[in-house]
Every structure is written in C-alpha cells, then in structure tokens.
Amino acid sequence: MGLRGIVMYATPVCYLFAEPAELYFVYRALYAQYCCRLHTVSSQTGDILQLSRQFECVFQESHPHLYYHLLAIAAPPLKLVFNWIVFAFAGYLEVGQVMALWDRILAWDSLLVVPVAAAAILAFREKRLLECTCADEVHLVLADASTLQVVQLLQLYLFKDRIDALRD
C-alpha cells in the first residue's frame, strides 16, 4: 500500500481528533476492520475482488447503455472507479462526504456501500458520460467531485424506483 495509502485513509480521520493518541487508535481500528480488506485478495466478504465484482454487476444491471458505451470508448467502468473503491473515496470526495460515506460503512458494518457509491456517481454523471467519445473526456467529466453529495446519490440510486412510484 505504501505511504500514499496510509495518508489517504488517515487524512479524513485527522479532522475528527485533536489528540494524536486518539487519532492513532481510531485510525488503527478503522484500518484493521475495513481498509485492510481493500488491499487484500481473499475469499472473505468485502475484499477488493468481491467489491470490484459487486460494482460491475450493480452498474451493468442498472445502467447497461452507459456501461457498454464506456467500454466502447476504451474507458472500462471498473478502471474508472477502482481507486475510488480501493481508497474508499478518500482523496476523491470532499472530506465531509468521505466521512458521510464512512459513517454508512460503520453503520452497516460493510464495505459493500463503496461500490454502490461508485455506481451512483457514474449514474449521476450519465448524461455527460454518454456524450464522451474517448477516455480522456470521461476522466475530465469525473475529475471534479466537489459538488457531489454522496448520501443523496446513494439514496437516489438505491431507491429511484420507489421515489418514481411515489411521484406517480
């Protein structure tokens, strides 16, 4: 993983604690329980292979047109979001949004929310992504995450059918 990975995981936690000792113990527990699985290949639930597969299945099933469009322009969806998943969005989303997502990980005691969040972000950017003709354009569309509200995107992605049914 290296120093970059440690820093990526530790930085959001630094906003929560003034005392280094508290920070260390919380970070250690977070890493031991969740983050280490993002760098492990195993048969355990929540390892990086399972999360990658989960992303591909969820995204392909919910947005097949976008999924195949991205493949056609040499921008495989998993390749686009892999670092988001590996670092649980640290370094991509704003710190407050990372903390909101990590709160869901802790609440559900599961990393499965991470690939769903990745699919939700691609789905949210669907219109602009479908206009892209090459991988470089896709990267430009996804580069700015400053306005993303991850909890709202998750809710919209997971409950869109129910929301639409309530409107009818």
List each language-model region with its residue ranges.
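Helix-rich, well-folded core regions that mediate interactions or catalysis
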Residues: 1-168
